[in-house]
Amino acid sequence: VLSANDKSNVKGVFSKISSHAEEYGAETLERMFTTYPQTKTYFPHFDLHHGSAQVKAHGKKVATALMEAANHIDDIAGALSKLSDLHAQKLRVDPVNFKLLGQCFLVVMAIHHPSALTPEVHASLDKFLCAVGNVLTSKYR
């Protein structure tokens, strides 16, 4: 459960990334594909090379969805309902991949905003990303 302080920390971080959605999203995906190559199996039709237009476009979608969840932090399930349906019913993404993506996102935040990622903010972001992952996997059951 996200506390009021967690919510404030998450909103603070996401206020810094809105103008970098494509860049940070693509970097998160590239990092995930490199670190966890098994995640590439969901993107057989993508050019997965650095700088790929497809990775940039999908990265922007990922970052935009995370921003949407942060903007509706009191109703993440409502904000991501359609995305949850898509991943559970059509794409059938292995739920562990959401955790891997979250870890890569935290690394990207640490690289670009090291002073903002205090231990407290890191913990808040981790809780938020777990909440997002739980929402995205809730319709698998």
Curated annotation (Swiss-Prot):
Molecular function as annotated in GO: haptoglobin binding; heme binding; iron ion binding; organic acid binding; oxygen binding; oxygen carrier activity; peroxidase activity
Tissue: Red blood cells.
UniProt-listed GO biological process terms: hydrogen peroxide catabolic process
Keywords on record: Heme, Iron, Metal-binding, Oxygen transport, Transport
Gene3D superfamilies in UniProt: Globins
Residues that hold O2 according to the record: H58
Occurrences of domain Globin (ranges): 1-141
Binding-site residues for heme b, renumbered to this chain: H87
A GO CC term attached to the entry: haptoglobin-hemoglobin complex
SUPFAM superfamilies: Globin-like
InterPro entries in alphabetical order: Globin, Globin-like_sf, Globin/Proto, Hemoglobin_a-typ, Hemoglobin_oxygen_transport, Hemoglobin_pi
Keyword Heme recorded: yes
Entry keyword Hydrolase: no
Subunit record text: Heterotetramer of two alpha chains and two beta chains.
Protein purpose: Involved in oxygen transport from the lung to the various peripheral tissues.
Family, per entry: Belongs to the globin family.
Protein name: Hemoglobin subunit alpha
The organism's taxonomic lineage, starting at the top: Eukaryota, Metazoa, Chordata, Craniata, Vertebrata
